[in-house]
Design a protein with these regions (language model features):
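Glycine- and small/polar-enriched repetitive beta-structure motifs of secreted/surface proteins
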Residues: 1-208
Length: 208
């Protein structure tokens, strides 16, 4: 009797195992086809063709042929169509940008940049109004905020060179350093409020 019972038990167990092996693939297939289990398109990492990466509402919204751009934040690089090698991190950073090789980190940094290239802006509204200026570096909130066409400027500190519009090759280090300079060139100011009241200064020697 024991042998018969054991044999029956073995047969039942083997049958259950075989059923499990047959049913399991179907179960997995059903789970995989559930809406929540499907892959997200685009993928969560925001990778797109051409080496572009976008994360955030309308980030890189207008992109067509540009390559190697990174946009993180709502509206970051939203207007970029064909610009290459730009990096925007922050709300509306590089929003209107169409140029190349620009880096903006901070809300509205390089917001109006349309033709400038090789600019670096770090901080809230740094280089906000830059349109065609090139190779500028702004680090700090409002640094070079009003620069439009000036080139080769370096501003480090909150409000440094904030009034500069078309001046070139200026260096300001410190809060509000050279903050009233609008079109002067080749100035260097180090320290808080350094050269605060300068309006126009050049390296051109006086004549006469």
């Amino acid at each position: 009797m024991k042998t018969t019972t054991s044999t029956i038990s073995n047969l039942i167990n083997n049958s259950l195992l075989r059923c499990a092996f047959i049913i399991m693939p179907f179960v997995l297939m059903c789970v995989a086809t559930l809406p929540g289990a499907r892959a997200v398109s685009p993928p969560p990492d925001g990778g797109y063709p051409g080496g572009n990466t976008a994360e955030g509402t309308d980030a890189l919204l207008s992109l067509s042929s540009g390559t190697n751009n990174t946009a993180i934040g709502a509206d970051a690089l939203a207007n970029n169509v064909s610009g290459n090698d730009n990096t925007a991190v922050g709300f509306q950073a590089l929003l209107l940008a169409t140029g190349n090789h620009n880096t903006a980190v901070g809300s509205e940094a390089l917001f109006f940049d349309t033709g400038g290239h090789d600019n670096t802006a770090t901080g809230f509204q740094a280089l906000l109004n830059n349109t065609t200026g090139i190779e500028n570096v702004a680090s700090g909130a409002f640094a070079l905020i009003n620069n439009q066409t000036g080139d080769f400027n370096t501003a480090t500190g909150t409000g440094a060179l904030q009034a500069n519009i078309g001046g070139d090759a200026n260096t300001a280090t410190g809060t509000a350093a050279l903050s009233d300079n609008t079109s002067g060139i080749n100035n260097t100011a180090n320290g808080v409020n350094a050269l605060f009241l300068i309006l126009l200064a050049t390296t051109t020697p006086p004549t006469g």
